[in-house]
């Protein structure tokens, strides 16, 4: 960011030296970073293990500071001679704001990683329970699924006619686990299960995930 502020058009990168303007720039940068959470996490996911490892290669900090600087210069109450002041912004102040943004960026990523770890733990527990116990209903996650006369039923009210007369609890378990594992191969979030359909059409068991915007018919 410091290098970008030393471009040939030096006059475009000068701030009023009073504390209010410095604080306004700082607050607006922090607010823009908070509002750019989705953009930041998308870049983080795309980068994977090859992502930035230091402040010079942060995901979004420099871009946020440059965007906010341009926005600050365009406000109506900005002094007309703002771009003509001889005093450049103090580099120490700039670096302080930059470091604060880097800390905020890392905090957002850390919170996201903790969320992923929690989802992975929940998924592991779910799969372990399915393997060790009778088949748990994926919709209510409380009661056991049963297959009676070709219909998959649960105490929670779930009732889905099977598409195959040969469906067993073992086959249904394998189908559920396979679908969850296939989803987890490309998305770390825990999917949700629901029943679709009504009286006129046959009910189906649906697996969906809001995080990656995917869905699949399980049964």
Curated annotation (Swiss-Prot):
The PTM Phosphoserine maps to 18
The answer on whether this UniProt entry bears the keyword Zinc reads yes
Q: Could you say which residue ranges form the zinc fingers (RIP-type)? A: 137-212
Q: Where is this region: Mediates nuclear export?
A: 164-180
Tissue spec. comment: Widely expressed. Expressed in pancreas, kidney, muscle, liver, lung, placenta, brain, heart, leukocytes, colon, intestine, ovary, testis, prostate, thymus and spleen.
Fill in the subunit field for this protein: Interacts with the RPA1 subunit of RPA complex.
The protein here is known as RPA-interacting protein
